[in-house]
A protein has these predicted regions:
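Membrane-embedded alpha-helices of multi-pass transport/permease systems
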Residues: 9-13, 27, 56-85, 115-123, ...
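Short cytoplasmic-facing helical segments at TM-TM junctions of multi-pass membrane proteins
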Residues: 72-111
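Cytoplasmic-entry segments and transmembrane alpha-helices of multi-pass inner-membrane transporters
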Residues: 13-45, 71-75
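Transmembrane alpha-helices
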Residues: 63, 96-128
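Transmembrane alpha-helix signature in integral membrane proteins
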Residues: 1-16
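Generic hydrophobic transmembrane alpha-helix motif, especially the helices
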Residues: 32-64
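Transmembrane alpha-helical segments of polytopic membrane transport and secretion proteins
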Residues: 170-199
Length: 199
């Protein structure tokens, strides 16, 4: 849920600071500062205000997910070719239409890249969340640290967490590549080059 809330808040913020670029530096700096706080310290700070349990973990995941989502949304929107946007304006498109029909589709792969990073980070934070009473796979790791010969427990908790992170990373990386607008252009230019070589 933390990553979902971060998408709901972070993507509009990323779009907003891409339109008003003077605000990009303070917004990204604040998100960067949050990111520099160690996850276990952030959980401890929030635990004092919110108590033990999953809510504290969700809020922590939300805070750590903001930076990659805001930054990638901002970067994706800013890097859209101005000539394409000018062509849209020339066709009589409004600012909202350019955003919906040009900027967001062309920056979607970059935004998904931010979500991918946020999800991988979130998995690590959720595992640590067991230390403050949130029921996760990290429970098994904690049991292992408390037992005299806990290597089996630690591996039983750590391996599934690592596998989930790897699967999500590979899946979203594949989706990123599929949605990359430059992918088709690269493919076409390679085919063109091969045809020229044959001639």
């Amino acid at each position: 849920y933390g990553v979902l809330f971060a998408c709901i808040i972070g993507i509009p913020i990323g779009i907003f600071i891409a339109k008003y670029r003077r605000l990009s530096w303070p917004v990204i700096t604040i998100a960067n500062i949050i990111q520099t706080v160690p996850a276990i310290a952030m959980l401890a700070i929030l635990m004092l205000a919110m108590g033990l349990g999953p809510t504290t973990v969700v809020v922590t995941v939300f805070l750590y997910s903001l930076l990659p989502i805001i930054k990638n949304t901002y970067t994706g929107i800013v890097e859209v070719d101005e000539n394409i946007k000018d062509a849209g304006k020339g066709m009589g498109m409004t600012g909202n239409q350019i955003l919906r029909m040009i900027e967001l589709p062309l920056s979607l792969s970059v935004i998904i890249g931010g979500v991918r990073i946020a999800l991988v980070v979130a998995i690590g934070i959720v595992a640590i969340g067991s230390f403050i009473g949130a029921p996760t796979l990290g429970d098994i790791i904690i049991r292992g640290t408390n037992s005299t010969d806990g290597t089996t427990f630690i591996l039983a908790g750590a391996i599934p967490i690592a596998l989930i992170a790897i699967i999500i990373d590979i899946g979203l990386r594949y989706l990123e590549k599929r949605l990359d607008p430059t992918r088709k252009n690269k493919k076409d230019s390679m085919q063109e080059h091969q045809v020229q070589k044959l001639h």
